[in-house]
């Protein structure tokens, strides 16, 4: 399978990504094929507006129940907020993937 070359985020996360405050994203199985070492074009989900490029550092499986304060810190939010956001986006999904990245 070819590694994805694009990634989208809700526009509300753009400022944190650009400021380096958000350094991971948590996705479901449909987005687990990002490959470490590749660079992706990043755009807003709502408008499709490109706002940066990210280098994928790692892709690791994680269960929703294993999310902790460290993940929340990397997402620049509290653990309670992180879990709430994940449940809104991926209701009822236990198997997730942590994608770590850096802006290039």
Swiss-Prot record:
PANTHER family: UCP029143 FAMILY PROTEIN
Keyword Hydrolase: yes
Domain ASCH: from-to ranges: 7-93
Signal peptide: none
InterPro entries per UniProt: AC4CH, ASCH_domain, PUA-like_sf
Any Pfam family hit: ASCH
Keyword Hydrolase found: yes
Family: Belongs to the N(4)-acetylcytidine amidohydrolase family.
Phylogenetic lineage: Bacteria, Pseudomonadati, Pseudomonadota, Gammaproteobacteria, Vibrionales
Reaction(s) catalysed by this chain's protein: N(4)-acetylcytidine + H2O = cytidine + acetate + H(+); N(4)-acetyl-2'-deoxycytidine + H2O = 2'-deoxycytidine + acetate + H(+); N(4)-acetylcytosine + H2O = cytosine + acetate + H(+)
EC number: 3.5.1.135
One GO cellular component term noted in the UniProt record for this chain: cytosol
Keywords tagged on the record: Hydrolase
The protein, known as: N(4)-acetylcytidine amidohydrolase
